[in-house]
Amino acid sequence: MEPAAPSCNMIMIADQASVNAHGRHLDENRVYPSDKVPAHVANKILESGTETVRCDLTLEDMLGDYEYDDPTEEEKILMDRIADHVGNDNSDMAIKHAAVRSVLLSCKIAHLMIKQNYQSAINSATNILCQLANDIFERIERQRKMIYGCFRSEFDNVQLGRLMYDMYPHFMPTNLGPSEKRVWMSYVGEAIVAATNIDHALDERAAWAKTDCSLPGEFKPELCVLVGAIRRLHDPPCYTKPFLDAKSQLAVWQQMKAIESESVSTHVVVVEALKLRENLAKAVQETIAYERHQYHRVCQMMCNNMKDHLETTCMLARGRTLATLADLRSTRYNLALFLLSEMHIFDSFTMPRIRGAMKQARCMSYVERTISLAKFRELADRVHNRSAPSPQGVIEEQQQAGEEEQQQQQEIEYDPEMPPLEREEEQEDEQVEEEPPADEEEGGAVGGVTQEEPAGEATEEAEEDESQPGPSDNQVVPESSETPTPAEDEETQSADEGESQELEGSQQLILSRPAAPLTDSETDSDSEDDDEVTRIPVGFSLMTSPVLQPTTRSATAAASSGTAPRPALKRQYAMVHTRSKSSENQQQPKKKSKK
């Protein structure tokens, strides 16, 4: 318990024993750092309390060679009663001596009380700092235990294997036998081994988070800085003036020999002594007021700010650590879910996908706050993407698409009046070339009863035209190395005559048009190939085109054999080329002249 502020009378009755007892009382109320406070912080606080107390002037400097030994009981009684002799104009040597001794004793006691208040203020600041350090590190210890308990219950004790053990029944394929289940579980163990690096990285991050949440490294230097700041803030008011005034007055009395001189009245000495004692008491009161109120309030305010900072830091660290814990738990759960989801689709690509994803996620587990399930699957897709079609599947799809396209083309019914495309015409010519030629004797005479005979004869004429290509009006006839025989010339003439008679008898209007000139590439291909491919002229028109007669293989075969034709799967068109007799006669002499 701190002593009350002294008055003038308290200074008069104080003695050395009471002052020493008060000092021992201050030492008994000291607060010391606990074991939780780090050693260097505790030493810093205790050293600040043992520093030399500020002393502007020592008692010897203030009182000089004056004797300031303890007074006797009789002298104490006289000192306490000197105020009763203020109006005494006589010269009482005993009273004057008691007044001078009271000034000396007041200076001694005031100096001791000021030093004691200095020490009390420093001890109080040291106690505040020790209590602050104890509170801070006790709060940090509670926070550490709380965070460690959270990690232990929600992360350390819930390892990857434990998670997968709790979750694997939901992901095991249902169609596995006992032996297959054992094989599947062995592969699950391999997947856990592949993910060990990621799990260790999560454990390391958890250890870092635990270290950050303990916060001793942050508050150790801050406490040391606070101790030095509080010690430097101790700046009590100056107390030297009343002591110097007392010293000068004592020197005057000594020079005047006021105690022995009869000329110096008791009234003058007593009044001056009471005035000096009052000034000393005021100095002591000011010092006590500063130490107990101003300096103590400043120390308490700084320590409270430190406590508020501690609470704020602890809350932020707790939130940050719990957020890290949630991220680590989420990453570990996503890792277990990824492994089991991959094992659920158990094929030859499962283990390569898992190993590749674990290698790529190794660095991410240290850098990223959390790794989602989608990220794990994305890393696995970089190794092998199950959703992407395989090369064999692409080939099969292309083949299937080709078959469907061919089937659609077969199902299309062409309009008889629609001219064939160039590609279809080439395919039809090739099919016509592959068909065996119909025998004229079996097919019957020209212009017979049946309707298939004109189509058969037209096909034979088309084949003869292909076997014996003839140039158009604008085309140069190349010289042939083979010379036709007379028998062939006669057959050609008879066939042309029969064709002209048949066309005249059927009353069909055929508008002949000269064929378009062929390009150089077509001329070259005609010269190189043995078989001529019929092409659509450049100036083609339905009104001036050759007659299109639909024919099929079944119809041709039926016409040659005399049987009924089978239904055709696809319409085929043959170009019926008509030549005038004059052009044939013009070409025939050329061949004969060549011969």
UniProtKB/Swiss-Prot annotation:
It is found in: Host nucleus. Disulfide bonds: none annotated. The keyword 4Fe-4S does not apply. The IE1 protein has some additive effect on the trans-activating properties of the IE3 protein. The lineage of its organism: Viruses, Duplodnaviria, Heunggongvirae, Peploviricota, Herviviricetes. Residues 384-595 are annotated as: Disordered. This is Immediate-early protein 1. The keyword Phosphoprotein applies. Keywords: Early protein, Host nucleus, Phosphoprotein. It comes from the Viruses. Its main location: host cell. Residues 392-401, 503-512, 550-567 have a biased composition (Low complexity). GO terms for cellular component: host cell nucleus. Residues 402-416, 423-443, 454-467, 487-502, 521-532 have a biased composition (Acidic residues). Residues 469-484 have a biased composition (Polar residues). It comes from Murid herpesvirus 1 (strain Smith) (MuHV-1). The gene is IE1.
